[in-house]
Swiss-Prot record:
Entry's Gene Ontology BP terms: amino acid biosynthetic process; aromatic amino acid family biosynthetic process; chorismate biosynthetic process
Co-factor binding details: Reduced FMN (FMNH(2)).
Entry-linked Pfam families: Chorismate_synt (PF01264)
Role: This reaction introduces a second double bond into the aromatic ring system.
Gene: aroC
Family named by the database record: Belongs to the chorismate synthase family.
Keywords noted in UniProt: Amino-acid biosynthesis, Aromatic amino acid biosynthesis, FAD, Flavoprotein, FMN, Lyase, NADP
Native organism taxonomy: Bacteria, Bacillati, Chloroflexota, Dehalococcoidia, Dehalococcoidales
Matches recorded under CDD domains: Chorismate_synthase
Required co-factors: FMNH2
Signal sequence extent: none
MF annotations from Gene Ontology: chorismate synthase activity; FMN binding
Chain positions recorded as FMN binding sites: 125-127, 285, 300-304, 327
Protein name, as recorded: Chorismate synthase
Amino acid sequence: MSNSLGKLFQITSFGESHGDCVGVVIDGVPAGLAINVDEIQIEVDKRKSGAKAHTTPRREDDRIEIFSGIFNNFTTGAPICLVIWNKNIDSSEYERTRSKIRPGHADFTGFMKYGGFNDYRGGGRFSGRITAGHVMAGAIARKLISTIGIEVIGYTAELGGITAKLPKHKDIRQNISQSDVNCPDLAASKQMVALIQQAAEEGDSLGGVVECIGLNLPVGLGEPVFDTLEGELAKAIFAIPAVKGVEFGAGFGASRLRGSKNNDPFNIQSDQIRTTSNNCGGILGGISDGMPLHVRVAVKPTPSISLSQPTVNLDTMTNTSLEIRGRHDTCIVPRAVSVVEAMTCIVLADLALRAGIIPRVIKQ
């Protein structure tokens, strides 16, 4: 398994969905960064179940424990170890259907790759539960990149085919705080909630699109040719379970434009070189260009549904069917927002350190 990400700001994820805990070790955080457990907890609370409409009935406190690397509310420069204990575990449904591989899940591929020794309960290492560790690391990264003025904002841009109309950047956070699905378009938000409720009643699930923007990025983040800004972001974001696509700026839409329409013309704005449009999504040649970073992330429908689905029994090697009765989200898109934000912050922190923009000791 590959469980680490990053070069200088490096995270190592550990834990399983129904194991004792989930957590993360973060290496390379500069000393002197002011951070306390409450700041990390705020980010973790955004992704936990029960915070948004029709999330899994599995309720976890998700209280963070700091094992190392933070002393007197400052980072010490040592590895930071953060842990959340799993307390509300019910593996009975997974034991009942253990031999039946769940369509849309990693049960089959995990079984084949690890010879059946992998922890299958709740999806084990393949579960969205492990993203609690990603979000904890993202909270540290968010605080670190804030020292150079970078802000990262994610939101639900589309859910079940309902598309949000986006307000100005300054209004997004305020609107999201009033939405049950992290959508800045409050009219679309109500429609999304109703659609989630309908899908839940029908025993089905929904997917959608998360958008993430990064503001105030300096020019120069990204290490061509193999560690480009979009390459590192795509790798990190694809580590989120259920993500099936990532695009930047105009993305695949650029393939349908002429160069005269896709190119972003340069001009001088407040003594800075900027572009009058942003089809490149803030990245040119794999390097940040000073414009807002714009990422779109496709999230597939939750594969755990209560409708009967054809599958295979691994023990008997026969065709069978499966109805999933466990505790699952009808739509994970609203909860995925905080994870996409976290992975974006982690990559930006790593690349800012590699570029020498963030020092090894933070002086207040």
